[in-house]
């Protein structure tokens, strides 16, 4: 056995914010405190960050309600708050704006931009190409377990919208519903 100094990382390498059932029998505030404790944050830091996140995400009035009583959008926001409370180097998000109202969506976009401006990296999985275009610098187009393109957004898009480029890359359905003539009203 050797002696020496053990250094503990203060910032987690990455945190994922998956679409999953959280500890929904805790209140939003309790859940944030729990997540902060998991990352060994001190109590003052936990309280400061939790209150700041609750306020920024418009969850203060619901902070003491059980998460199981939250709407889908509120649950998405508390999940994001739990992931970001430890200030990870990399944040992995699945459909970060799904189920949130437009105002909350704008707030989440601002929080993510601020996170990136502060040196963090955000990895987003989304089927909403407009969201990806508005938030991402680099993209990877993956379909059917195959990587079709990766690189800077402009390089992958090649002057087209990401939606059109995605369909082009993955060989989208050429039919596009033309056979549904009964949908036409006379």
Where in the sequence are the language-model features?
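Catalytic Walker B motif of ABC-type/P-loop ATPase nucleotide-binding domains
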Residues: 91-95
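A short, surface-exposed alpha-helical micro-motif characterized by mixed small hydrophobic
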Residues: 132-134
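Helical segment within the ABC ATPase nucleotide-binding domain
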Residues: 105-118
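Conserved ABC ATPase "signature" region
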Residues: 33, 37, 44-62
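ABC ATPase "signature
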Residues: 150-151
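Conserved catalytic motifs of ABC-family nucleotide-binding domains
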Residues: 87
